[in-house]
């Protein structure tokens, strides 16, 4: 499906937000399933329910509160999505990624994407954090790309490169932040693969995804990253490993959304500290609003 939004639609939403808040964010953070507690770390917070904001879709999944929260985190002006949108909710990719282009028009230059993911890499354990080094856009192989349709040069070029989608310098700074935290558990790094959902993977599918080189699998993130890079935003992402993907027919365990939420809750404090420290390493704003 081609983009149902015009440039003016994005502008109207950005102008509505500008007129309702004095915050001028530099960093946008998309909070994944069960990770919305990051917003509690913001100072001078100001929140809007998605249903207040023109053109914004609505979150329908447990663990996604459906609020846009502005504030400051470690000296950086931020806007956080307390809940994202997914293909499996029935949303087009232009709706899934709508907020990212609005953030760009608000002056955001850095996007931090977080998600809950299943671990495909046998070395990963539940509770691990994996920095996203690269991604595999599985829906993209079937023509589901958020940039499909006429290109708007005001956002970016027709054929954007994705070989450097995740900022290398930010990943290195993330490793430094992890050391600063004194965590005993190793900080992981790997490739995230997106499936459309809402079903979890079969054993055969899981084995195939691992053969493709994926370390973690989830149902989000990639469309937002593609649109962010199209707009020229710096992108940093990480996955919280909330379950180990079943890759053996003799394994009777089953993935569930409840365990995803519980793993997010258990790791909340660690994640909040990690993102907070990481904010210090984001370069100052390069362009004025």
From Swiss-Prot:
Binding residues for phosphate, per the UniProt record? 33, 64, 84-86, 116, 220
The entry's keywords: Acetylation, Cytoplasm, Glycosyltransferase, Purine salvage, Transferase
Question: Is S-adenosyl-L-methionine tagged as a keyword?
Answer: no
Q: Which reaction does it catalyse?
A: inosine + phosphate = alpha-D-ribose 1-phosphate + hypoxanthine; guanosine + phosphate = alpha-D-ribose 1-phosphate + guanine; 2'-deoxyguanosine + phosphate = 2-deoxy-alpha-D-ribose 1-phosphate + guanine; 2'-deoxyinosine + phosphate = 2-deoxy-alpha-D-ribose 1-phosphate + hypoxanthine
Q: In which pathway does it act?
A: Purine metabolism; purine nucleoside salvage
Q: Which GO terms describe its molecular function?
A: guanosine phosphorylase activity; identical protein binding; nucleoside binding; phosphate ion binding; purine nucleobase binding; purine-nucleoside phosphorylase activity
Residue numbers bearing the N-acetylmethionine modification? 1
Q: Which InterPro entries match?
A: Nucleoside_phosphorylase_d, Nucleoside_phosphorylase_sf, Pur_Nuc_Pase_Ino/Guo-sp, Purine_phosphorylase, Purine_phosphorylase-2_CS
- Using the record for this protein, list the coiled-coil segments as residue ranges, or answer none: none
Principal localisation: cytoplasm
A cellular component term, taken from the record's GO annotations: extracellular region
Q: Name one GO biological process term.
A: positive regulation of T cell proliferation
Q: Where is the signal peptide?
A: none
List the Gene3D superfamilies hit by this protein, alphabetically. Answer: Nucleoside phosphorylase domain
Which chain positions carry the site (Important for substrate specificity)?
243
Q: Where does a purine D-ribonucleoside bind?
A: 88, 201, 219, 243, 257
Alphabetical list of CDD domains matching this protein:
PNP-EcPNPII_like
Q: How does it assemble?
A: Homotrimer.
Family to which the UniProt record says this protein belongs = Belongs to the PNP/MTAP phosphorylase family.
Q: Which PANTHER family match?
A: METHYLTHIOADENOSINE/PURINE NUCLEOSIDE PHOSPHORYLASE (PTHR11904), PURINE NUCLEOSIDE PHOSPHORYLASE (PTHR11904:SF12)
Name it: Purine nucleoside phosphorylase
Task: Write the gene name.
Answer: Pnp
């Amino acid at each position: 499906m081609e983009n149902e939004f015009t440039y003016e639609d994005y502008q109207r939403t950005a102008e509505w937000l500008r007129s309702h808040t004095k915050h001028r964010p530099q960093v946008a953070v998309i909070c994944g399933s069960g990770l919305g507690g990051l917003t509690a770390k913001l100072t001078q917070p100001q929140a809007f329910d998605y249903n207040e904001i023109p053109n914004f879709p609505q979150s329908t999944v447990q663990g996604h509160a459906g609020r846009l929260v502005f504030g400051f985190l470690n000296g950086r002006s931020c806007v956080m999505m307390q809940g994202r949108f997914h293909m499996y909710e029935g949303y087009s990719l232009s709706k899934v990624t709508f907020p990212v282009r609005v953030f760009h028009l608000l002056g955001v230059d850095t996007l931090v994407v977080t998600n809950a993911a299943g671990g495909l890499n046998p070395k990963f354990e539940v509770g691990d954090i994996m920095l996203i080094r690269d991604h595999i856009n599985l829906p993209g192989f079937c023509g589901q790309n958020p940039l499909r349709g006429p290109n708007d040069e005001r956002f970016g070029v027709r054929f954007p490169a994705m070989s450097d989608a995740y900022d290398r310098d930010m990943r290195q700074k993330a490793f430094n932040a992890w050391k600063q935290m004194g965590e005993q558990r190793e900080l992981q790094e790997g490739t995230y693969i997106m499936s459309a959902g809402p079903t979890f993977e079969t054993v055969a599918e899981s084995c195939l995804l691992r053969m493709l080189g994926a370390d973690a699998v989830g149902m989000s993130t990639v469309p937002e990253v593609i649109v962010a890079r199209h707009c020229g935003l710096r992108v940093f992402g990480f996955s919280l490993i909330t379950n180990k993907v079943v890759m053996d027919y003799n394994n009777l365990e089953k993935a569930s959304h409840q365990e995803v939420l519980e793993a997010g809750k258990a790791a909340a404090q660690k994640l909040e500290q990690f993102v907070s420290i990481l904010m210090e390493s984001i370069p100052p704003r390069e362009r004025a609003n």
